[in-house]
Structure formats: structure tokens, C-alpha cells
Swiss-Prot record:
Catalytic activity: N-acetyl-L-glutamate 5-semialdehyde + phosphate + NADP(+) = N-acetyl-L-glutamyl 5-phosphate + NADPH + H(+)
Molecular function GO labels: N-acetyl-gamma-glutamyl-phosphate reductase activity; NAD binding; NADP+ binding
A GO CC annotation given for this chain: cytoplasm
GO BP term, example: L-arginine biosynthetic process
Keyword NADP on entry: yes
Pathway involvement of the protein, from the record: Amino-acid biosynthesis; L-arginine biosynthesis; N(2)-acetyl-L-ornithine from L-glutamate: step 3/4
Role of this protein: Catalyzes the NADPH-dependent reduction of N-acetyl-5-glutamyl phosphate to yield N-acetyl-L-glutamate 5-semialdehyde.
Catalytic site positions: C157
Domain of life per record: Bacteria
Main localization of the protein described in the UniProt heading: cytoplasm
Protein name: N-acetyl-gamma-glutamyl-phosphate reductase
UniProt family annotation: Belongs to the NAGSA dehydrogenase family. Type 1 subfamily.
Subcellular location: Cytoplasm
Length: 364
């Protein structure tokens, strides 16, 4: 079978670059176009020397004319840019937006955290997201919405870690919807590729940790709450039933997110043993190949998942505090962005879900 042709916009950024790295080794895709803005006319050998397969490609302008004509189009653009471009793209192409423009279902949430034009919600690209329960008690998942779709919204990286950590407890009614707290240690690539920001310079970043977007202002908050609502079997319009204290902290590492998410135990949870609570997480991720619930007593570490599409998970209880603590470690560029996007793209095209992906990290 002929390979699917792929165009990547935002090809010289971190997210676009990771998409290119994964797609270059994928057996079913052929990268035939790379597009950018400030780097137009430059060789990819300059920008992505670690991907020698791209050395002969030259960065083209990000226009519909350049992107159309390919089977798959990956948009790794700032929020606002993808939405403006998307309506001009071939309706028969599969378009994956790695940005925020098509993630949120409710315009009120978009207006509060982003502002500007609100674009239509696309099929959400988190296959493992719990979306409710079937009549037999098994979980329904977002995976079922992906086959055949032509438009995919890639989740945020912090959203991915926070959602995967806590959603089993939400789905089974083990945690209260109020007073959820998430503290995330985030690698500097999560802040994007911006040489104008002095806090991203090595002299500023090395040996320093820096909180950012604090006080309920981080733009990933409404997306996390939307996912929590779905995990509880509710609609996005009911996301306001959940409250989240969210603090991301930039740490001196290039990749990785370690999410520590805690929530008050419900009366139901208090009747369960620690082993029974752990069994809830085990059941929730049974058969989800990229989800790794670590052995009891082993906590996730970002160094173990670099370069992989896996999420390393753990859950513990603090009976004195009356809280459940859920942990997730992911590679923010792979599982948190491009890897998850390729996983969703595989499903949309009817390819093996794990094609071109690995759950084996690079360590040390």
C-alpha cells in the first residue's frame, strides 16, 4: 500500500519537530512538505539535523496552497493560527491540530482563558480518555470517536498528564469534585521555542525552578475540567462542577512532565482499602497499552519516559489528610503532544494504534 503523504506546518518548532521525528520512522507515512514562517526557504538540515531523512526538504510558507494536496496535515501552530487556516484546508485530508484552537467544547471557557475567535470543536485526540460507562459497567473511551474522523484536536501536554493521573478516581466516584489540586513539574520545551524570553536562556534556567501561569490563569485548566466532566459521565457544560488548583513549575530539564494530582476522598473511597483503590486504577488502564501502572511503592520519574508515548502512573492514599494522590510522568513532546497525535491519527486511518510509536523510554 502506498504511504500517506504528510505536510507539517510549524515544522521548526518543538512540537512540529517531534511530530517529524516520529513520522520519519513511521512505516505508513511519507513527509512530503514542511512549512514555517520565519524560516521559509531554509533547509531542514539546519533546523532538524537529528532527522537526516529531512535534509533535502526546504521550509515553505504556511499557506493553504502549500499544505493542500497531502493526505495528512499536521498543524503545530500558536493558538489562533490553526483556526484561521483550518477552514481553507482540504476537507478530505486528515488534519491534526496540535494547538488549542479546537480542543474546547464550550465558547465561554474559550472566551475566559483565550479570547478571540472561537473555532469549532474537533474530535479530541486522547484515546484513553474515559467518557462514561456502558450498560455492562465497562468504560467508554474517546478512542471510539476517532476511526474515520478527518479533524483531530491534540490535547495539551499538562492536560494529558493531569487527566491520565486522576480520571480513574473520578470515573469511580472515589474523589470529590471540589478541591482538586495539581502541581506539575514541566521541562522547558513545554514553554515553546522563543528566544525573546530571557527566562528560557540557559543562564536563567539552569539550577532554577520557576512557577508560571499561577492563580487559576493557566489556559489548560478548562480543558482539564472538560476531561474530568467526561470521565464522570457528564457533558462539557457541567465542567464547572469541578474546581482545580493548578500550578505548573518549569524545571531545568528539556523534556518531561511529572504531575502530582490530589483530591479529597469520598465516603465511598474511605470504605476501600489501599489495595482496592489501586485496583481501580489497574482496571481503568487494563488493555491500554501505553498506560503503565507502576508496581506498588514505585513512583513515576520523568527520566524513564523520555522519547516514549507511555504514561507512567501511580496512586497512593493519605488517610490522615483524607486525600488520594495520583501521579503521572510523561514526555511532554511525545505522549503529551506529537506521540498522542500520531496514535490518534493511526486510529483515524485504520492503522495499528501503536504503529511508529514506542512505550520504551531512553534512560539514563
Amino acid at each position: 500500500m502506498a504511504k500517506y503523504t504528510v505536510a507539517v506546518a510549524g515544522a521548526t518548532g518543538y512540537a512540529g519537530g517531534e511530530a517529524l521525528r516520529i513520522l520519519a520512522a513511521h512505516p505508513d507515512f511519507d513527509i512530503t512538505c514542511v512549512a514555517g514562517h520565519s524560516s521559509v526557504g531554509e533547509s531542514m538540515a539546519k533546523h532538524m539535523p537529528h532527522i537526516p531523512q529531512l535534509a533535502n526538504l526546504v521550509v515553505e510558507d504556511t499557506t493553504p496552497e502549500v499544505l493542500n494536496g497531502h493526505d495528512v496535515i499536521i498543524l503545530a501552530l500558536p493558538h489562533g493560527a490553526s483556526g484561521k487556516l483550518a477552514s481553507q484546508l482540504d476537507p478530505n485530508a486528515v488534519v491534526v491540530d496540535l494547538g488549542a484552537d479546537h480542543r474546547l467544547e464550550e465558547q465561554a471557557a474559550w472566551d475566559e482563558f483565550y479570547g478571540g475567535d472561537f473555532y469549532e470543536h474537533w474530535t479530541y485526540g486522547m484515546p484513553e480518555l474515559i467518557t462514561g460507562k456502558a450498560a455492562d459497567g465497562s468504560y467508554t473511551r474517546q478512542r471510539a470517536a476517532l476511526p474515520g474522523t478527518k479533524r483531530i484536536a491534540g490535547p495539551g501536554c499538562n492536560v494529558t498528564a493531569t487527566t491520565l493521573a486522576l480520571q480513574p478516581g473520578i470515573a469511580e466516584g472515589l474523589v470529590e469534585s471540589q478541591d482538586i489540586v495539581a502541581d506539575l513539574v514541566v521541562g522547558y520545551s513545554g514553554a515553546g521555542k522563543n528566544l525573546k524570553r530571557t527566562n528560557l536562556l540557559a543562564a536563567e534556567a539552569l539550577q532554577s525552578a520557576l512557577p508560571y501561569s499561577v492563580g487559576g490563569k493557566h489556559r489548560h485548566i478548562p480543558e482539564i475540567l472538560q476531561n474530568f466532566a467526561h470521565a464522570a459521565g457528564k457533558s462539557a457544560a457541567e465542567a464547572s462542577e469541578f474546581t482545580l488548583g493548578f500550578t505548573p513549575i518549569l524545571a531545568p530539564m528539556s523534556r518531561g512532565i511529572l504531575a502530582t494530582v490530589s483530591a479529597r476522598m469520598t465516603d465511598k473511597a474511605k470504605t476501600l482499602s489501599d489495595e482496592e483503590i489501586r485496583a481501580v486504577w489497574s482496571k481503568a488502564y487494563e488493555g491500554q497499552d501505553f498506560m503503565v501502572l507502576l508496581p506498588e511503592g514505585t513512583l513515576p520519574a520523568t527520566g524513564n519516559i523520555i522519547g516514549s508515548n507511555a504514561a507512567h502512573l501511580q496512586v497512593v492514599t493519605d488517610r490522615k489528610a483524607g486525600r488520594i494522590y495520583a501521579f503521572a510522568a510523561i514526555d511532554n513532546l511525545n505522549r503529551g503532544t506529537a506521540g498522542q497525535a500520531v496514535q490518534s491519527l493511526n486510529i483515524a486511518l485504520g492503522l495499528p494504534e501503536d504503529a511508529g510509536l514506542t512505550k520504551i523510554g531512553v534512560a539514563p
